[in-house]
């Protein structure tokens, strides 16, 4: 746990270039107790913003308080609990130890009160990230930022509570591979094989047009007219035409003899 080592002159929070801000909440109050020799910076109630990174919790106070920033790494925190009192805002409490060169000594009990809400969400995320960090896992959404010459990155104060946005000009980290899955590999045994097209017969030959036939004779025309006149058409069966059977020609006509000649 370090004192006044994670803030900038412009009011932003400073983290290492291998960290990222996972979550932040404004309108948070921080108090300490159970300290033998209470330094001046630990007295009273601190008001500001709390940040969650993959490896620690950082509190950034507002105003001209002697405690400008306060950092608590997970490996120095214990007995963390989320409390929901009947009266008052929800809060997170626990114990933290000082680290070597952190600006103070000993241990202290802390209390983070979320006056505008968010204690349950922040506490659940903090416990999950701390558990992953203890196993050496990289928490979800924890992407490192490009190398900075100073070895740190300055985040401006957040606009609103919730997830902290990426800094301006920094390309958003690529989504995990399972976020935009590509098309599944097709099994060869299940693939659909289109049959080949039928053989092409080639261009069709133009129809053969016979030459002009001989003009019909008057006798043929008369015979056709006679057949058409004697044909029978049935409307119920329009595809068939009934024609009478061929009969022998009638006998020759003889004019009656003149009675006078008889």
UniProtKB/Swiss-Prot annotation:
GO CC terms of this entry: chromatin; cytoplasm; nucleus
> Domain GRAM spans what residues?
1-84
The question of whether Secreted is a record keyword is answered with no
The record lists the organism as Rattus norvegicus (Rat)
In its UniProt entry, what is this protein called? WW domain-binding protein 2
What is the purpose of this protein?
Acts as a transcriptional coactivator of estrogen and progesterone receptors (ESR1 and PGR) upon hormone activation. In presence of estrogen, binds to ESR1-responsive promoters. Synergizes with YAP1 to enhance PGR activity. Modulates expression of post-synaptic scaffolding proteins via regulation of ESR1, ESR2 and PGR.
The protein's superkingdom reads Eukaryota
Any GO BP? positive regulation of intracellular estrogen receptor signaling pathway
State whether it acts alone or in a complex, and with which partners, per the record.
Binds to the WW domain of YAP1, WWP1 and WWP2. Interacts with NEDD4. Interacts with ESR1 and UBE3A.
Residue ranges, compositional bias (Low complexity): 219-231
Modified positions (Phosphotyrosine) in chain numbering: 192, 232
